[in-house]
Amino acid sequence: MIQFTCKPKCFLGLLIIAIIQLLPAKSFAVVQPVTAASQLVKRLLPQYVGRFKFEQIKTTNDSDTFELESKGNKIVIRGNNANSMAVGLNHYLKYYCYVSVSWYKNNKIYVPSELPVITEKVTQTARCNSRFMLNYCTFGYTMPWWKWDDWQRFIDWMALNGINMPLAITGQEAVWYNVWKKFGLSDAQIRGFFTGPAFLPWHRMANIDHWDGPLPMSWIKGQMLLQQKIVARERELGMKPVLPAFAGHIPEALKAKYPSAKINSLGEWGGFPAKYRSNFLDPFDPLFNKIQKEFLAEQTRLFGTDHIYGTDPFNEVTPPSWEPAYLASVSKTIYNSMAASDPQAKWLQMSWIFYFQRDNWTNPRIEAFLKAVPQDKMILLDYYCDNTEVWKMTDKFFGQPYLWCYLGNFGSNTMLTGNLNVVEDRMENAFKNGGKNMWGIGSTLEGFGVNPVVIEYVFEKAWENGPVNTDKWINDWAVRRRGKPDKNTEEAWGILNKKVLMQYGALGQSPLTNARPSLTGHGDWDTDNKIEYDNRNLLKVWGLLNEPSTGVLPDVYRYDVVNIGRQTLGNYFTVVRDRFADAYNKHNLAAMNKNGEEMMQIIHDMDALLATNSSFLLGKWINDARAMGGNEAEKQYFEHDARLILATWGQEGSELTDYANRNLSGMLNDYYGKRWAMFIADVTTAVKTNKAFDQKAFDKKSNAFEWNWSQKWDVFPAAPKGDSMQVSRALYKKYAAEIAQ
C-alpha cells in the first residue's frame, strides 16, 4: 500500500492545526423561505427569475403544503416553508414543462421558452413531514470527491424532491481532531486513526481504523469548510441536517491516556487484519459522557445543530454482550449522554443492524434496546424496506417513530433494478397500516447507481394522498425524460415498468463483465449477474430509445440511452461467456477463439458507449479525487484512495474486492477487460496443453492484478467522447440480431 505522509513546512502545518482549533463559532444566517426559493430559481433557471413569485402560507397542523397558480405572466408558488415551495416548483417543472431535473450538475435543465399556464389552481399536502435522504456509505461510494458545485446541485435536487432530513456527516473529522486534541492525543495519533477519504464512512461507523491513512490535514480543513456551506444551504431550503453524535468509537491511543477506561475491541470486520479493528468505549465509563459533551459542543460550534443526531452503535459488529439488559443500558446511556448536552436531542438510528444480524437481534433484544430511550426521542430508519420491512417483524418498532426507507443500491453498483409496483404496494401499506409512529419515508441508497426513477418515485409518493397508478406515473416520467410527449419513449418506459424493473436492488449485483472471471457462475458474492427479465425486452427498450422524435434531446435522455444500452450488452456478455465455457468443455479451440474475441469486443464496445456520457467515466472519478490535492504527493494519495475502493477495497485478495464495481468507461477496458483477457488466455492455454483450467491459480493471479491496478497512475479521459445517440445506434445495429435470438 502507498503510505502517504504529509510533510509540509513545520510552520504551515502548525498554522493549519491552529486555524481549525481557533476558528470562532460559525454563525448561520437565517434566510427567509421566500428568498431561499427565489434563489433556487436563480441557480437552476436564471433566465426565468422574474417569472416566478413565491409566497409563504400557514397550514393546519403544520402540514407541508404547496399551491400553484398562474397570475398574469407569473407562476405563483405558495408553501408553508422553503422546502414545500421547492416541491411546488418541481411539480410545475415536471407536469407542466416536462422537465426532469437530475442530481448531477453536468445535466442541463431544458425549459420551454414560453412557460406553460396553470389553468386550474393546484394544491398538494404531504402525507408525512419527515423525508430522509442518504446513507453513511454514499459519502464513500458517490460523494468523497465532491466539491461545492456538486453539493449545491444535489441539495437543490433534494429540495425539489421534498427531502428535509438529509444525513450530513461531511467534515466531522475536524470536530474529532479538536476533541481528541483536548483528550491529549497528538496530531500523528489523530490523523493516523482516520482512514483514507473514500473509506471514512466505515471508520465513522466504527468498522475500521487507519486503513489508507493517515488523513492529510488539508483534507480535514477543506471538508470542514465544505460542511459549513452544506448545512447552511440545507437549512435555507427548509431541511434539518442530521449530524453525528458520539457512539463509543475511540482511538486505540486513548488507552494509554486513560488506562482505567473500559475499552474493548469491536472485533473483525470485512476480513481486515486485527490492526485495523475499531475500539469501543463502554457507555457506562465516566469518560463516555465527557467525550460526548466535548464532541457535541465542538460540532455545534462549527456546524450548528437541528437537534437530530445519527448514532449507530454495533453497526455490522458484535456487541460485548447480547443480554437485553445490557443492550437497554447501552441505548439509555447513549441517549442520556446526548440529552445532557442537548435537551432537545433526538437520536436517529438505522435499523440495518437488526437486518444484518437478524439471527442475533431477536425481538426481546430489539425491544429492550429501543424502549430504553424515552418515547419519540429515537427515530428508526427502516433501512431496506425494498427487501425486508423490519417494522412488520418488530411490532412497529415497539412504538418508537420510524421512517419507511428504500435502499435500492449497494456500492454504487450499476445494475438496472427496482420494482415500482412493489415499492408502491409496500409504501401504501405502511402509510395505511404502519401505525401513528410511522413518521415518514426516506432513501438510504449506498451509492447513486443508475436507477433515479425509483428514488424520485419514493419521494413523490410522500405527496400523494393515496395509491398511485404506476403505469401513468412511469408514462409521465418518460415524457419528462424526453422533454415532451413521445410515442417511442413512452412505450419504452412502459416496457421497463411491466417487464424489466422486476427485482429489488440487492447486495453485490453487476453485469458479468465486472465479475472475477470464471467458467461458471459469477465470480465472487458481490458480482451477481442474475436478471429476472428477458433481455430481449430490454433490447426492445433500447431500440425504442434509439429512435426518439425530432428535437433537442435532454441530457437525462441521453443518460437513459447509454444506461439501457450498456445493461443490454452486459446481459448479453453472459450468453457469450457461457458459449466460451461450453467450447472449453468440448475442447473446441476454434469456438473458444471466436467467443473469446466476442467477449472482448463487447467489453470494448460497452466502454465506447459509456465514454459518451460524463456520468460513466473512470477518468472523472480519478480527476475529481486528484483535484482535492494541493500538491503532487496529495494528488497521488487521493488517486490511490479512489482506485482502491473500486478495486480491492481492502488488502490484496480482500473479500470486499469488486464490492464497489461499476460500469465506467476506463474500468471496462483497463480493469475488467484486462482481467477477462488474462482469463481467456489462460483457459485457452489449458486446452492447448491438454490440462484442466486451474481456477484457484487464476484467482491468485487475479488478486495480484487487482492490487497492482490500484497502485497505478494511468491517465483516463475525464470528459465524454463521441455522440451517445450515434454510438448507441451503431451498437444496437451490430448486436440486435444476436441478442434477439
PLM feature spans:
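Bacterial N-terminal signal peptides
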Residues: L12-L22
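Contiguous, structured surface segment used for ligand recognition
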Residues: F28-C128
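Stable alpha-helical elements in mature extracytoplasmic
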Residues: P33-A37, M85-L89, D150-F154, L226, ...
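Catalytic-core regions of glycoside hydrolase
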Residues: V49, S100, N106-L115, L134-T138, ...
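Second-shell loop/turn segments in exported
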Residues: K74-G79, G140-P144, M217-S218, W322
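Active-site-adjacent substrate/metal-binding segments within catalytic domains
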Residues: C128-K147, M158
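Histidine-centered catalytic/metal-binding microenvironments
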Residues: D524-Q741
